[in-house]
Amino acid sequence: MMTQHTLSQLHQLRLGGMARALEEQWTLPASHSLSFDERLGLLLDRELAWRDDKRLERLRKQAKLKYASACLEDLDRRRGRTLDERLIATLASGDWIRQRHNLLLTGPTGVGKTWFACALGHQACRQGYSALYLRTPRLLEQLRIAHGDGSFGRTLQQLAKVDVLILDDWGLAALEENARHDLLEVIDDRAGSRSTILTSQLPSSTGTAGSTTPRWPTPCSIAWYTTPTES
């Protein structure tokens, strides 16, 4: 009776991790020899781990990453791929998010820009940041609809609160004036307060004047920039 009553109270207090750990302790004879402080410490450790797992699960679900399982540990390091390991380590640390930097991933189709952006989004979730993946054409359609139903301002506020916003397929097609203005609103609201990742097929400015052939310095180029803030 006392066992079920205690478990019920733990669940009422939303201490699911402690409840599971307590059930395990009751079934493991070795735990009976532990002191009260030792058993309590194990229960608290399990609760913290359980909450971390639940928070990560929630953040990953909200992020809506195109490649939900993408992670930096699985980055393809085969010979022939030019990877700046120090840059990858810096990005993995999350310092660029804390410093409100933004990332631009450029390169031709198929080099892994979207996968890498999703891996960075997943890493951000691991570190407790919120993330959101959106294809730029889909975002523009959402903003167009928001103008019509009166939710444009609320949509901008929601986007401005995301710690890491991933905008895929940036510059895929020419934009009308209204669409350019909407994107500027999104970027301006996030300037200096949140981080944004853009992926684009647009080449870096390495081509010669008048050149019509896109050129990239590497298969997938990474650049970061800081949006100026008003003093």
Swiss-Prot record:
This is Insertion sequence IS1162 putative ATP-binding protein. Keywords: ATP-binding, Nucleotide-binding, Transposable element. Pfam families: IstB_IS21. It comes from the Bacteria. Belongs to the IS21/IS1162 putative ATP-binding protein family. ATP binds at residues 107-114. GO terms for biological process: DNA replication. One of its GO terms (molecular function) is ATP hydrolysis activity. The keyword ATP-binding applies.
